[in-house]
Amino acid sequence: MLIIQKYGGTSVGSVERIKAVAQRVKQTVQNNNTVVVVVSAMGKTTDDLLSLSKAVSTNPSAREMDMLLSTGEQVSIALLSMALQELGQPAISLTGAQVGIITDAEHGRARILEIQPKRIQHYLNQGTVVVVAGFQGMSSGDNFEITTLGRGGSDISAVALGAALKANLCEIYTDVPGIFTTDPRIVPEAQLIPEITCDEMLELASLGAKVLHPRAVEIARNYGVPLVVRSSWNNAPGTRIISPIAKPRSLKGLEINKAVYGVELETNQVKVARWQGRDRLGVVAKLFGEIARDNLDVNLIIQSIQEDDAKDIALTVVNRGFEQGETLGAAVSETKLKELITSALYGATWQGSEEVEMMVEQNMATVAITGTGMIGRPGVAAKMFSTLAEAGVNIEMISTSELKITCVINAEVCDRAVAALCQAFEIDRSVVLGPDSIQEFSTDSSPSPVCGAVLDLNQACITIRHVRDQPGMAAKLFGQLAQENISVDMIIQSQRCQRLNGIPTCDIAFTVAQADAEAASMALKALALSIACGEIIVDTDIAKVSLVGGGMVAQPLVVAQFFEALAQQQITIQMITSSDTKISCVVAQEEGVKALNAVHKGSIPVVKNYAQTPKGLATPAKPTYAG
């Protein structure tokens, strides 16, 4: 069996740790395995090298930085190879260039184009352990420049080698026992997850879980590389990351594959939007409690905040049994929806006199592009929006995730939208989803779909007031950000239309990394005059708390528990977005840690049979979720 083992900086942070890793590698070989080891720089070596560069230059070139930083891994691979040889195990150390990792020429953030495994395969056939420098490669073309893959690059190197060599297993060894349901440094009750899907892991990684780089998960998902995240301090089994059965694909352009693999259309959607004055704490929790009790299928959820601090919430409901041309079925009738929202707003005190401001649009559809690494590729969303605009399709709601970008549109133009997207992204065919394709869940007995909760304190919210509500506006806004290579996470389009000089407008808000907030604001201000929008507001005092899990929004009881947990802690929700695999809320930054603890306690299942010890976890019985 061919096994790739990757060891992070803390795992090889001292001579003693390197010797311990050598013992583990030798034992793996003795268990009748062939082994490739990918190693990071020792301890804080990379940080020390960065400090040295700053000491001699205020603005070092990206090329020289790659030349400098790549030396850190060369020290650790040579030492580990020596340690293996000392144990009588044949081993050889090779740089990324020497094993044939070919990248593009983007110094500091290179992407792998291909791996030429001939040399590494030669040594493996001789029974030699190959110790590879992670984080680095060599540019294509005639220059043969040393390149680095960016922070977390050793994860990427290991999984890419696993794909190129068709490894049976790729083990990622770290200083933690595996993937936890949340950050155990913030939430002591965090539990180790025994098993997680690639889709779930990709969302967790993109939301800030730092155990595994999102690009590494993306490669594993695309090529079906089996992954395990384990502690280098003990023999506990860690967390298995389950990859889907991979479709045959070329190893050329390994990290430069098409971002979009498919187009999905889902009809039979009803859009429900309501708005209110000042926020009433717990209203969203009550609303989804009512939805759960009536077992309605909710597809997307958004909430935004208006200029006058009023809030609106919109959601799409799947209309089961609805046939084109018929009126709404009883399950999602306009009257029923209004009753649900009224009950959530006013409860038992409602006397029938209060008017609920609500809009129900029956003939709606969702169109989505699917792939991997969507948020990390800022041009993808912009291209989708511009394609729809050119086809004359107006976007009413937007949902983003690492796996899918979804837009709510009028069903009358859905065929036009699908055709345009298939042509723009070179997709051969689209998938039409219907009510029968939606998994049914019992609110009483099915296990929680939630696998983890993540807190991100490094986001900023940018709000653009009074954007014209017409096709093409989202394309212009996010196209401008894509030109600046700024990735956008949450996107919320207000559902309350305001007319200025007779022109319908709405507010659009989105989140970016705090480090990109100033550049994003400047880029949009340069565009503001040409699109005649209003004020641009930047808020860095926010936190984003998210739940991740497959099919989560299809279980409204879980969504209700999420919102109820926040309401019980008196935490005000500023914004909400959802997708198939996650639901995210923006709250005040000072309430971020409290929010994470609340939603983890209220929404995460318990993992049994793991006992914490000072140096990690004792070898457990097979872990299970508590019922």
Predicted segment positions?
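Nucleotide/pyrophosphate-binding catalytic subdomain
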Residues: M1-E218, T316-V318, V408, V587-E591, ...
